[in-house]
Amino acid sequence: MQDQLGREINLKATPQRIVCLVPSLTELLVDLGLSDRLVGVTKFCVHPENLRKQKTVVGGTKSIHADRIAALKPDFILCNKEENTQEIVEICAQIAPVYVSDINDFDSFYHFVNDLGALLNCLPKAETLNATVKERLFQFRISVNSEPVRNVLYLIWKNPLMAAGKATFINVLLNECGFKNVIKEGNSRYPEVDSELLKKADYVLLSSEPFPFSEKHIAEFETQTKAKIICVDGEYFSWYGSRLLKAFDYFEKLLTEIN
């Protein structure tokens, strides 16, 4: 099998000692019933809540303790193209087989979950999760079908001011919610933006991650634009694991509040 970057994955047996360097995918592994096989996580793997107390924390998503990972004797390491650096992937590949995910839309999400199910011998649960997400997405699309299109700017960082571009999973979910990203095609995935772009939006969404935007930042942006400023939970817009099972309820509530 190949991972989503086309790298060959060669496993001698079904993995029993997994290290995951992607917070959203750590949550996914647990929801697939694989918590007992999970031995190492990052400091940002905050879901489930007490997991970090039960597993070995091996660093962050951009900086790892390779010695800690090696000491765990993992037989499978899960990374992500966007969350982790190429250097981290190369270091981990010297320790155990590494699967690098690259999830930019629902099709790549479904493909990844099926891969995980096959590699980790939990395919029935993986297929059930995919089917549930597909059904929930279908229902959500029906509920927002009559929503007006709203121009939106989704901010992820403050200094410099940065937004989610169109080639992101965040943008896919914005579109599903009836939003149109004011970032132009061809820009980087997370371009720097200026105050002029703020003025083109009907709504400016302040994400709770990676920069921890909160209510205290709203007034500052209200002086720069007539757009409605709203704080949103970034996990529901950017976590592409089993968090999607809860995301559509969150989006429905958000759209109700906007209306």
Where are these regions (language model features)?
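N-terminal ligand-binding lobe of clamshell/alpha-beta domains
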Residues: 1-259
